[in-house]
Amino acid sequence: MEVTQTKAEGLSRTFAVKVPVSELQAKLDARIEEIRPQMRLKGFRPGKVPAAHVRKMYGRDLMGEVIDKLVNETNQKALEENSLRPAGTPNVDMQADIEKVVTGKEDLSYQMHVDVMPEFTPVDVSTLTIVRPVAEIADEQIDEALKRIADQNMKYEPRAEGEASQDGDAVIVDFVGKIDGEAFEGGTAEQQSVVLGANRFIPGFEEQLLGVKAGEEKELNVSFPEDYPAANLAGKAAVFETKIHEVRAPQTPEMDDEFAKGLGLESLEQLRGLVKDQLANEHTTASRSKAKRDLLDKLDAAHDFDLPPGMVDQEFEQIWQQLQREMDAGRVSDEEKAKPEETLRDEYRKIAERRVRLGLVLAEVGRIADVRISEAEVNQALIREARQYPGQEREVVQFFQKNPNAMAQLRAPIYEDKVVDHILETAKVEEKTVTREELFAEDEE
């Protein structure tokens, strides 16, 4: 066997590998002898099938096994002998005629292409200064949260006879939608509650129910939006024939002890305490997220080294595919969609490079600090993942147990969080008082 490094550019390596026919045949003979004792063929005693017969019947398949195993072993040996850490699975470019190799007429020769991990020394995280924003919880914020709870528990009471509907009212209505005089599927309902101003119906529907009274009938002239999900309705004008059964006015409950008791609590004071605790948890989560972002920015600025091209390409493809899905779903801003594709690709490749760089830095910091994940932590994450698929929990768990790549993806964010926690515990952390709005403002990638 001959293994020769033929290329070393940046983090890319190429090895030329050649295995003579004689070595392949020797390994095939060894494989045949390995399986002969277990073979059962008609006309032969158990375990006594002649090697020549086994070669004749199964030689082709067995040689395929030999080649696959030999390629894997050779690749691993080449990396170990050259003290290289692969940044992904090596790519094999077969140079020989594989048909001739399998039949023993030609040496096995191929090229192995592999990206290797960069060598770098991470910054001493104890020298970093991380800014952690904090915000006080004001009584006004608690009051706003309580108001949202009250709104969620709002009840609607019938308006007085002859009283017209107003914005915010719930109108109980029957309707039949028609296009060109023909009723269409999904356009009919009875005793439907329509909250005016909630914008849950197509534009113009709720607005035209303002001022109606119980017992009235009214035609609503509307047009479906051009981007309406049902393609057969998109952009078309429609008429909804409606019959008003009842007009109900919203009644916001009083925020007092009785309201709290209705929620299973003892008093309004206890409810305020629970709301404050919830807000505190939200602040803690947002504060850590901001501190993590500052930490990642500082790590990114402190490191400059070559990145494995394959890792960057893979990360970019994932980001790009996600962007395409977001565009298809209409969740991308007009400003973003207006950019030339080349500009977008440049921007998102920089994001991919940042993610790969930070992933490598965090992994090295974690290795040096001996950060580890416990099986209990992995199991908890697995349970959380399984619970997202009610009724299929067992199948989800089995999927992860049988798929190392999926399990690695499950472990990755757990490990990252533990490394981030380690850095936040080691670095100097300065608290900065900000407003709640600043604390929850979204960061750009």
Swiss-Prot record:
Catalytic activity: [protein]-peptidylproline (omega=180) = [protein]-peptidylproline (omega=0)
UniProt-recorded Gene Ontology molecular function terms: peptidyl-prolyl cis-trans isomerase activity; protein folding chaperone; ribosome binding
Highest taxon listed in the record's lineage: Bacteria
A GO CC annotation given for this chain: cytoplasm
All residue ranges annotated as the PPIase FKBP-type domain in the record: 168-253
EC numbers for this chain: 5.2.1.8
InterPro entries: PPIase_dom_sf (IPR046357), PPIase_FKBP_dom (IPR001179), Trig_fac (IPR005215), Trigger_fac_C (IPR008880), Trigger_fac_C_sf (IPR037041), Trigger_fac_ribosome-bd_bac (IPR008881), Trigger_fac_ribosome-bd_sf (IPR036611), Trigger_fact/SurA_dom_sf (IPR027304)
PANTHER family registered for this protein in UniProt: TRIGGER FACTOR CHAPERONE AND PEPTIDYL-PROLYL CIS/TRANS ISOMERASE, TRIGGER FACTOR-LIKE PROTEIN TIG, CHLOROPLASTIC
Family of the protein in this entry: Belongs to the FKBP-type PPIase family. Tig subfamily.
NCBIfam families associated with the record: tig
Protein name: Trigger factor
Gene source species: Hyphomonas neptunium (strain ATCC 15444)
Gene that this sequence comes from: tig
